[in-house]
């Protein structure tokens, strides 16, 4: 089901949908605007963040969390806006073709976030995760994972910029409940002087992968020689399980929501859901 409007159409005539949500055959179906009103109410109450924090604060969960070993990473969340909506901010450019969703000729047009913006979702930014991949209108989702059991302990969403991962990493680690001396594993995108210095200023040892292609790494042998560095680099890859579940199962690959606040709300709920999926098995394991 691609949208909330289509969902309500299904509930209207699909007996399986009615059975699943407990509606009798002759019960009236609520209006689709109920979703929007309830979502706005949850946004105002910051329910997603509070729910995420409440799961981690549970007395049964807290002993599972490492207070000093963490990993950080980010992923792109494709916006619901299409590339057709990415138009010059000054209003120039060829007009779209006839029709509600008319075609536009982008041939020869240079497009960037400085000169263009989406008319459908102004908070979305043109971005790509790596060279060789197509650029898409996206948001950036970020997670900090504790390394003992691979549970997410911090999550946030930002506009997809070149420094978004490092900026979000600094903010999340600064607000994290952790031991005074901690370690943070990360990939080579975090290997910058600014990020490494910020982590050390927070009392966090940056176990970031070294970026050796054409520039000097911000960390040296004083960090990489320790056995803990290799362990952090091995375990940090588990954070991809959070993003993999969110995109394949949680519907996070392409958001149906618009605007940074709403997309962030949806991302945080999905990360909390990932923790909940993991917890029954972890709690049932012998101490």
Where are these regions (language model features)?
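TerminUS-proximal long segments
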Residues: 263, 273-275, 280-283
């Amino acid at each position: 089901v691609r949208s909330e409007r289509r969902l309500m159409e299904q509930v209207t005539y699909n007996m399986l949908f009615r059975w699943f949500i407990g509606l009798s055959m002759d019960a009236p179906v609520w209006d689709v605007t109920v979703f929007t009103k309830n979502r706005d109410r949850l946004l105002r109450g910051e329910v997603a963040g509070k729910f995420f924090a409440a799961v981690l604060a549970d007395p049964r969960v807290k002993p599972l969390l490492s207070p000093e070993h963490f990993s950080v990473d980010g992923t792109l969340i494709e916006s619901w806006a299409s590339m057709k909506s990415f138009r010059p901010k000054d209003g120039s450019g060829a007009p779209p073709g006839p029709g509600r969703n008319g075609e536009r000729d982008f041939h020869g047009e240079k497009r960037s976030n400085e000169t263009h913006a989406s008319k459908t979702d102004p908070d979305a930014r043109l971005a790509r995760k790596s060279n060789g991949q197509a650029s898409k209108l996206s948001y950036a989702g970020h997670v900090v994972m504790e390394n003992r059991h691979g549970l997410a302990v911090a999550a946030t969403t930002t506009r997809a910029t070149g420094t978004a991962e490092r900026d979000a990493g600094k903010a999340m680690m600064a607000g994290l409940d952790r031991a005074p001396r901690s370690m943070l594993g990360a990939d080579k995108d975090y290997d910058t002087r600014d990020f490494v210095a910020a982590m050390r200023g927070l009392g966090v040892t940056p176990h970031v992968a070294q970026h050796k292609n054409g520039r000097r790494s911000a960390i040296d042998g004083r960090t990489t020689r320790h056995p803990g560095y290799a362990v952090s680099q091995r375990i940090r890859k588990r954070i991809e399980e959070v993003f993999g579940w969110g995109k394949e199962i949680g519907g996070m690959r392409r958001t149906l929501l618009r605007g940074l606040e709403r997309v962030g709300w949806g991302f945080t709920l999905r990360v909390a859901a990932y923790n909940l999926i993991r917890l029954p098995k972890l709690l049932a394991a012998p101490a």
